[in-house]
């Protein structure tokens, strides 16, 4: 029996030619960084450096930083990726040349209607949407939404008290996840869920479905390996965002909008109502107002961008407070002095709390939820002697930046004092970027910080937190997607004192 098939010469030539063409297709972009004199790991045909992500993106970035220095080039599939850590180059990319060259984030795969979301929209569409949404996140509007969020802070306290009374260790991911879900759905859609006690509510189930992300899913790999298939996926209505979930939110927004217009509920202050008001404002030209599809996309992206980030950040903060009891005590002292006898928090007092701000900032330094900031280069450009070709994705590796011992002495240590008034002014603003910076920074930054601080004040007014045998020490991270604890943070919750158990009526 012959081991080699007896093909004709023409067949062998065709087969050999096909293999050569496939190899060229899978590697033709791989000489870019070598030509530019930029070091980096050797790519694997088709995959680039993607397979090296198996230990997590932060670990990959750290290894590259140690080996190649302040700048390196690599490939995700065939996409050129340039990592930068020099503050001056970061400033140029994120701020100085944002509008002219580095306006857009990378669109990774087919998005469907989500390409209209503020986080994903490009160029003029992004500018228009940002202009329309910015008024919803002013300090005045946040102050108006504060009572709504305050209700969910009270709900968080009640849920924690129930668990504390049982004497069992508490899964903080469940608690903070429910709080985050309730705040986001309450402010983005105006619905009141109590998701901890109603886990099968359609809003809860679809929101969690929206957040499921598997980096090595076959669909994700097909996007990396064969990006030319993206238009085909778009035509077939196959997107990274589950169709059933997007359809649910589309119908929900339509129904809520119709109900509010019918009942003339124009005085609500949630994000959805603010967007509806912008559609009907006489101050906005019709061609500039948000379309209904854009309205759905913004409401949905609020969940995608706000749920996991808030709940994980709260988990990290409470873990650090638990393992640093002197910091927890000092923060409780500031809270008690600012709001005596468990008084209801106020927006104005909350934003003035210095030590609370220090604790939140230091946690975001150690655990940046988005491990990277990305911008796509729109045209060939030279920055500080570095040539960046059109189409290159320029990224800022936040774990590297936030844990560089040259910038942060003993970066693995939790030290809120790094962000004290005396020290804060000495921090280069382009080496601490938990929410990005420049015109395309996170629009919801102040909203997220307000949610986090309000939750911390309410729970630390009422409880202290201690480690238990189920607490993972040291904490390990899951870093394949957004940064979060590998295992849920589980702690012992101890009610504080016998002072008034305030359940403020924010409304």
Swiss-Prot record:
SUPFAM superfamilies: Cytochrome P450 (SSF48264). Its main location: endoplasmic reticulum. GO terms for biological process: oxidative demethylation; steroid metabolic process. The keyword Oxidoreductase applies. It is found in: Endoplasmic reticulum membrane; Microsome membrane. It is an enzyme of class 1 (oxidoreductase). GO terms for cellular component: endoplasmic reticulum membrane. Keywords: Endoplasmic reticulum, Heme, Iron, Membrane, Metal-binding, Microsome, Monooxygenase, Oxidoreductase. It is a peripheral membrane protein. Belongs to the cytochrome P450 family. This is Cytochrome P450 3A28. The lineage of its organism: Eukaryota, Metazoa, Chordata, Craniata, Vertebrata.
């Amino acid at each position: 029996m012959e081991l080699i098939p007896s093909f004709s010469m023409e067949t062998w030539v065709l087969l050999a030619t096909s293999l050569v063409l496939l190899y060229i297709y899978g590697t033709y972009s791989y000489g870019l960084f070598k030509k530019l004199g930029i070091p980096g790991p050797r790519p694997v045909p088709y995959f680039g450096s993607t397979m090296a992500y198996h230990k997590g993106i932060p670990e990959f970035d750290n290894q590259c930083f140690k080996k190649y220095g302040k700048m390196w080039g690599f490939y995700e599939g065939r996409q050129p990726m340039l990592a930068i850590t020099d503050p001056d180059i970061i400033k140029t990319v994120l701020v100085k040349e944002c509008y002219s060259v580095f306006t857009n984030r990378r669109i990774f795969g087919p998005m469907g209607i989500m390409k209209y979301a503020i986080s994903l929209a490009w160029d003029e569409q992004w500018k228009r949407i940002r202009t329309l949404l910015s008024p919803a996140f002013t300090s005045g509007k946040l102050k108006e939404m504060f009572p709504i969020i305050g209700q969910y802070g009270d709900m968080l306290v009640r849920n924690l008290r129930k668990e504390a009374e049982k004497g069992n260790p508490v899964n903080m991911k469940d608690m903070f996840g429910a709080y985050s879900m309730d705040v986001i759905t309450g402010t983005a859609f105006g619905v009141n869920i109590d998701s901890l006690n109603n886990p099968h509510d359609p809003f809860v189930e679809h929101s969690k479905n929206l957040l499921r992300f598997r980096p090595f899913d076959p669909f994700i790999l097909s996007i990396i390996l064969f990006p030319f298939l993206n238009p085909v996926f778009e035509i077939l209505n196959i997107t990274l965002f589950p169709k059933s979930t997007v359809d649910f939110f589309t119908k929900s927004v339509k129904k809520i909008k119709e109900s509010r217009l019918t009942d003339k509920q124009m005085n609500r202050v949630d994000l959805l109502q603010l967007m509806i008001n912008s559609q009907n404002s006489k101050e906005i030209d019709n061609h500039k107002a948000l379309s209904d599809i854009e309205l759905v996309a913004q409401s949905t992206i609020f969940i995608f961008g706000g749920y996991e980030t808030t709940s994980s950040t709260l988990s990290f903060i409470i873990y650090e407070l638990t393992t640093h009891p002197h910091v927890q005590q000092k923060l409780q002292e500031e809270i008690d002095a600012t709001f005596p006898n468990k008084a209801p928090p106020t927006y104005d007092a909350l934003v003035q709390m210095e030590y609370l701000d220090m604790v939140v900032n230091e946690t975001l330094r150690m655990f940046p939820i988005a491990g990277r900031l990305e911008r796509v280069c729109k045209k060939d450009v030279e920055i500080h002697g570095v040539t960046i070709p059109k189409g290159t994705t320029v990224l800022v590796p936040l774990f590297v930046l936030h844990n560089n011992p040259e910038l942060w002495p003993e970066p693995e240590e939790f030290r809120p004092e790094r962000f004290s008034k005396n020290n804060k002014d000495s921090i280069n603003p382009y080496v601490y970027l938990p929410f990005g910076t420049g015109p395309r920074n996170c629009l919801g930054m102040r909203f997220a910080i307000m949610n986090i601080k309000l939750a911390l004040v309410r729970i630390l007014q009422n409880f202290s937190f201690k480690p238990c045998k189920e607490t993972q020490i040291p904490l390990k991270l899951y870093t394949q997607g957004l940064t979060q604890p590998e295992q849920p943070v589980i702690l012992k919750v101890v009610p504080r004192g016998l002072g008034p158990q305030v359940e403020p009526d924010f409304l």
